[in-house]
């Protein structure tokens, strides 16, 4: 886990795996996306900020923690993106996200695909699920791993995709499924590319 400036708790399934829970508990600054604050507060924690339009925040929390709520009624984007924009405006670029998957598959796909937008906005972001971590990437990148660890690569705009340290060769994938279920052969691997792609590392 890399050092972060802040964490976003989205309004999907509350994390249950040890790694995302540890990332959440050790975060120096926590932004909850609207209703994501309900479970966080119920567990005895207090967020630094609650972002959104308040449509999924319990009335009791809305009243008691009104001073923490940063209202953003913009309906053209979602609360996760509003939280990223809020943090970037504060100069917080190294961002972890938890709770972005589960509950609704359409929200899950949307939250995952938006990671590429955050990369373009200048954020260094990782989204932790109960099964692995999504890392949006551009150009050539190297990752730490353990031998045999599963990894998937989803191509967005990358050309010239090549790998070092993975079991199976990669290429300029045209469908997301084509880059799934690869695995590490060493304690690190490198993706060589020009353009954008998304890496998923299974725990």
Ranges and model annotations:
Residues 43, 61-62, 107-109, 137-140:
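Short, well-ordered secondary-structure micro-motifs
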Residues 68-91:
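Short phosphate-binding loop-to-helix
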Residues 82-84, 90-108:
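Internal, conserved structured core segments that host functional sites
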Residues 117-145, 151:
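Class I SAM-dependent methyltransferase SAM-binding "motif I" and its flanking Rossmann-like core
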Residues 137-203:
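Long, charged alpha-helical interface segments
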Residues 1-61:
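N-terminal beta-strand-loop-alpha-helix module at the start
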Residues 106-116:
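Short Gly/Thr/Asp-enriched flexible loops that form oxyanion-binding sites at enzyme active sites
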Residues 10-12, 101, 202:
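Structural motif
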């Amino acid at each position: 886990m890399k050092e972060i400036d802040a964490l976003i708790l989205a309004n999907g399934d509350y994390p249950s795996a040890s790694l995302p829970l540890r990332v959440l508990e050790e975060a120096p600054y926590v932004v909850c996306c609207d209703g994501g604050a309900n479970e966080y507060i119920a567990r005895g924690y207090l967020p630094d900020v609650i972002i959104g339009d308040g449509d999924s925040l319990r009335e009791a929390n809305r009243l008691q923690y009104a001073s923490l709520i940063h209202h953003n009624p913009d309906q053209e984007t979602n609360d996760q993106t509003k939280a990223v924009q809020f943090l970037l405006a504060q100069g917080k670029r190294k961002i972890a996200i938890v709770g972005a998957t589960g509950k609704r598959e359409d929200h899950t796909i949307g939250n995952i695909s938006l990671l590429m937008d955050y990369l373009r906005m200048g954020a260094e972001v990782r989204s932790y699920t109960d099964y692995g971590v999504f890392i949006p990437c551009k150009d050539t990148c190297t990752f730490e791993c353990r031998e045999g660890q599963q990894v998937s690569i989803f191509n967005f705009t990358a050309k010239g995709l090549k790998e070092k340290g993975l079991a199976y060769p990669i290429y300029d994938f045209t469908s997301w499924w084509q880059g799934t279920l690869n695995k590490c052969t060493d304690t690190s691997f490198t993706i060589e590319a020009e353009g954008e792609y998304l890496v998923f590392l299974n725990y």
